[in-house]
Amino acid sequence: MKHNLPADLVTLWRDSPGYESARSRTFNQRIPPELPYAIVRPKNMEQIQHAVQLAVDLDKQIRIRSGGHSLAGWTLCADSILIDLVDFRHLEYDATTAIASASPSATSAQLNDLLVPHGRFVPVGHCGDVGLGGFFLQGGMGLNCRSYGWACEYLVGVDLITADGEYKHCSESENADLFWAARGAGPEFPAIVTRFFIRTRPAAAKYEKSTFIWPVACSDAVVSWILKILPELHADIEPLVVSTIVPGLNVAAILVQFLVFLSTNETGAEKLGPSLTAMPDGTLMEFKGVPTSIQQEYVSQEGTMPRDSRYICDSVWFKDGIDFVTVTRRMFREFPRDRSMVYWEPKYPTSRRQLPDMAFSLQADQYLALFAIFEDSQQDEEQGIRIQEFIQEIEPYVLGTFAADGMPAVRKTQYWSAEVIERLYSVCQKWDPAHRLGCTLLDPTRKVKS
């Protein structure tokens, strides 16, 4: 036993066998160099409390890893205690209340698989291996977010361990300030979530996907068309637009995908058809009404964003009312290279809703992200600079950034509204006055360690 830790609590010190393998348990193979003081893998609540006490005794910062999908590498902080929840697992559905409960290490795919037999649905992430911890805490840009809302809005309660090791349950009526923060604080959340309680909604009976691909030179016409149809596009349709080098065609192209959520007797043509009447000519390929499922979409996504690659990502919320076609033209046409892509996910009409009282507070009609995807570590600097060059060009039109897809180490931006920043800082000061858990997005005087 070292530092009075239980013998059965897996604790890896820097000189322990398996330390580096545990440190590098991340989706992004572009792994930050920071070395945690120790990596702890608890299996139950008591062991999480022991890990927190270790950090308190040693006066170390704490980082939490759920699924390891953070592209920015939030979980790696020099000389910290990394609490990896990979072995702390819970996933359950209560049919009497239609409430699911899940540990942060459960993934989007696992939650979806749990709910499918019950005919229930939560707008889980677009990547199946995204851990629910980071997903919910950062707001949760889930499936058909534009209509079904942010995933964190589905939370009805949270169990957690505080920065000093106490268990708390949080809801709108109990420890409400922590519950407020759990819905959007992201890496600044001042406690360790151990269980989410999630309301569910009826699932679609079936899904269809329609995909259309144009040469990238047609981007103006395609983007204009999407902007035109958004106000009337059926609420059960999720549109995604990607500009990339399309495998097989080996040309830069702009791709539009519609995922249609259907009841038993509905067809995709009924819901999507009216929006296709003004579709631009000149497609390279069309795939209409292809039956699919969330599970199948996850398999497809694994091919687009595999675990064995290096990623650099930055994203923006655009100010509403700008000339979106003109502002994004060069991005759509010139950014695609190799496997890199421009990803546009319109958020209208949910972007016009008054959000519930929660920490997640920054949204706009248009969300866009740039992804550099590559294998060679020698390209790290070049790829990062290239993304920032494109971002700097559009900076005057930017409202802020989605915390899950940002580059805080290189670009200062807005992640929350000004009012929420002040309130969130107060909550963090109350529950984590030693700043063991925060990742520096709130206070610019604290060093960014990702």
Curated annotation (Swiss-Prot):
Which cofactors are reported in the record for this sequence? FAD
Q: Which SUPFAM superfamilies match?
A: FAD-binding/transporter-associated domain-like
> What sort of enzyme, by top EC class, is this?
oxidoreductase
User: Which GO-annotated molecular functions does the record name?
Assistant: FAD binding; oxidoreductase activity
Q: Fetch the Pfam families from UniProt.
A: FAD_binding_4
Q: Name the domain of life this protein comes from.
A: Eukaryota
Q: What sequence ranges are listed for the domain FAD-binding PCMH-type?
A: 32-203
EC number(s) reported in the record? 1.1.1.-
Q: In which pathway does it act?
A: Secondary metabolite biosynthesis
Q: Which UniProt keywords apply?
A: FAD, Flavoprotein, Oxidoreductase
| Family membership | Belongs to the oxygen-dependent FAD-linked oxidoreductase family.
- Any idea what job this protein has? FAD-linked oxidoreductase; part of the gene cluster that mediates the biosynthesis of the indole diterpenes penitrems. The geranylgeranyl diphosphate (GGPP) synthase ptmG catalyzes the first step in penitrem biosynthesis via conversion of farnesyl pyrophosphate and isopentyl pyrophosphate into geranylgeranyl pyrophosphate (GGPP). Condensation of indole-3-glycerol phosphate with GGPP by the prenyl transferase ptmC then forms 3-geranylgeranylindole (3-GGI).
Give the protein's recorded name. FAD-linked oxidoreductase ptmO
